[in-house]
Regions:
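Non-heme iron-sulfur electron-transfer modules
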Residues: 1-10, 38-63, 84-111, 138, ...
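Ferredoxin-like iron-sulfur electron-transfer modules
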Residues: 6-27, 51-73, 153-171, 176, ...
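Cysteine-centered iron-sulfur cluster-binding motifs in ferredoxin-type domains/subunits
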Residues: 21-38, 64-84, 138, 173, ...
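Fe-S ferredoxin-like electron-transfer domains
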Residues: 86-192, 196-197, 204-211, 254-257, ...
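FAD-binding core/adjacent interface of flavoenzyme oxidoreductases
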Residues: 138, 149, 153-171, 187, ...
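Rossmann-like dinucleotide/flavin-binding elements
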Residues: 170-194, 234-244, 263-266, 282-338, ...
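Rossmann-like dinucleotide-binding cores of NAD(P)H-dependent redox enzymes
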Residues: 193, 197-228, 232, 287, ...
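Single conserved hydrophobic/aromatic residue that forms the stacking wall/gate
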Residues: 401-402, 406-413
Length: 413
């Protein structure tokens, strides 16, 4: 007769995604080597070991802190020889853990996230997604803030008020700049951050939709960094309002430049100057900054990255009846995180694979349609993805109001 534990393990194995493949994935370690959380937490997290635990002893895996430390970046999936989707395997186990009431492992994981990962409220909102396992995200964010405030009070009690290791300037208040400022201040440096825009946050404020990251959460993250002693000076463009010589004169011993890539690359096809075409980064920035944006009922988004998914979902929330994403390769080559694409489709976004725009068509200087062409996949290019090759004679036309989302962003010159 099977024990209750054996019965539970059998049930988990029968339901577990890619269970058979798991038996053969314990040798290369690519998942661990490519994991960003491993870089931050070290020995506290190892996805390969967690995967082995799920196969050998799933009941023990349900009570493991590690189960809750995957941040959904899919770097492991993109590099895995068997293309295992570890985030989705771990999500399956998280849901079972939630159903069985195994909440303490998550509480332990939350402590590690808050104490070791910069901008924990942002990463919990945008990366870890506890709500996907049936947990209350808002309640978790409150707990995370309480943990961090307690940590800050302890730090203030133990450390001197003034930094002891000199001054460093940081240019840009996006994720990179804020992370560097956070890390340097914790190590005893005096940090001044310069931001060209009126408010700090960079791409966090500019382009992540409000349904993914609220302004309230971002404000709390920035205030926490200020409470560490970091000075943030907005409305100052280094190179225009002051130069590097000024930074040295002010006593900064080093400068970190984290200005990001805020410019979209333009599609080099005919008709790109027509009204009604807007780049996705500009579109999201207009929405986040409170500007009125008028869209049509039929919207097309070009590109297969995460920005394209955000633009498409935001457009639906603004009232579009139909939103279609055009991507020139297949789903397997899509740069967007697979779960983001799935959520977009679940919300009603249609994704057309192996389709590329050929030219924009217009009436009265306003875009009215796209002439598209179907593609086929060839040999891999320098990125490792298979090349998209046009199929001669496969052109067709889509009527639209258009949002253009180039596949890459360009550095600011």
């Amino acid at each position: 007769m099977e024990t209750s534990t054996a019965t539970a393990s059998k049930e988990i194995h029968e339901r577990l995604l890619d269970a058979e493949k798991l038996k053969y994935c314990f040798e290369c370690g690519i998942c661990t080597a490519s994991c960003s959380i491993v870089e931050l937490l070290g020995k506290d997290y190892n996805p390969r070991v967690l995967l082995e635990k799920i196969l050998v002893s799933p009941e023990n895996a349900l009570t493991s802190d590690e189960l809750w430390l995957c941040a959904w970046c899919y770097r492991c999936h993109k590099r895995c020889p068997q293309a295992l989707k570890l985030p989705e395997i771990f999500l399956f186990m998280r849901k079972i853990a939630t159903q069985k009431g195994h909440t303490q492992p998550f509480e332990n994981a939350l402590q590690k996230i808050v104490k070791n990962i910069p901008l924990p409220l942002v990463t919990l909102s945008v990366c870890f997604h506890p709500e996907r396992a049936g947990l209350d995200k808002e309640e978790i964010l409150v707990k995370a803030e309480e943990i961090r405030e307690k940590s800050l009070r302890t730090k203030k009690a133990k450390t001197a008020a003034k930094p002891s290791k000199g001054k460093i300037a940081v240019i840009g208040t996006g994720p990179a700049g804020l992370t560097v400022a956070y890390g340097l201040s914790r190590r005893g440096y005096g940090v001044t951050v310069f931001e060209a825009l009126p408010e700090p946050g960079g791409m966090l404020r500019k382009c992540i939709p409000k349904h993914r990251l609220s302004k309230k959460i971002l404000a709390k993250e920035i205030q926490f960094i200020k409470d560490l002693g970091v000075e943030i000076r907005t409305g100052i463009k280094v190179g225009k309002d002051l130069n590097f010589e000024d930074l040295w004169t002010e006593g900064h011993g080093a400068v970190f430049v984290g200005v990001g890539a805020h410019k979209s690359q333009k599609l080099k096809i005919d008709g790109g100057e027509l009204r009604g075409i807007i780049h996705a980064l500009d579109f999201l920035w207009n929405i986040n900054s409170g500007q009125k944006v008028e869209i049509g009922k039929n919207v097309v988004v070009i590109g297969g990255g995460n920005v394209a998914m955000d633009a498409a979902k935001t457009t639906l929330r603004l009232g579009a009846n139909e939103v279609t994403i055009l991507y020139r390769r297949s789903r397997d080559e899509m740069p967007a995180i697979p779960w983001e694409a799935k959520e977009a489709e679940d919300e009603g976004v249609k994704i057309e694979f192996l389709v590329s725009p050929k030219r924009f068509l217009g009436e009265n200087e306003t875009v009215s349609a796209i002439e598209c062409i179907r593609m086929q996949l060839g040999e891999p290019d320098e990125t490792g993805r298979r090349q998209a090759i046009p199929i001669e004679g496969s052109e067709f036309t889509l009527s639209l109001i258009h949002i253009s989302e180039p596949t890459r962003q360009a550095e600011i010159s």
